[in-house]
């Protein structure tokens, strides 16, 4: 089950060592330890661009993990992979599932907004201005919530909201 460390990144190696120590000393069940090991292996594979391997590890982690909060991060990372592969519809499904388990996951809200904004831009290119406005409004709603949860994390989104007059309903 342990993944060989192919990445020479000091931070990744340090994380792996610390995670291994924590797994040994924390009072967790064998199932929880296995779930975390799969999750960690998934993150390592994802960082190296090995998306198929990362997905396999994340699916195994999902099979074993029972904690909703921990599952939210697994689902979020699966969404990231689908986003990277241009599978935006599938990515949205996983981001929504992550938010069901962890409504404070601002990065999932941000990524949903980014996808809606991208789709809005595509609609403009296709001459569908009404659809683009609907998509931009959806993006704005998700960005406002992400900014509400993490006010300093999404400066570009905040600027876009200001420039497009969509800042209403957000205390800044």
From Swiss-Prot:
Statement: the UniProt record of this protein carries the keyword Plastid: yes
Domain of life: Eukaryota
GO CC annotations, alphabetized: chloroplast thylakoid membrane; thylakoid
TPR repeat locations: 35-68, 72-105, 120-153
Subcellular location: Plastid, Chloroplast thylakoid membrane
Chief localization: plastid
Keywords assigned: Chloroplast, Membrane, Photosynthesis, Plastid, Repeat, Thylakoid, TPR repeat
Membrane topology note: Peripheral membrane protein
Alphabetical list of Pfam families matching this protein: TPR_1 (PF00515)
Gene3D superfamilies reported in the protein's UniProt record: Tetratricopeptide repeat domain
Any GO BP: photosystem I assembly
Keyword Membrane: yes
Described purpose of this protein according to its UniProt entry: Essential for the assembly of the photosystem I (PSI) complex. May act as a chaperone-like factor to guide the assembly of the PSI subunits.
Family: Belongs to the Ycf3 family.
Protein name, as recorded: Photosystem I assembly protein Ycf3
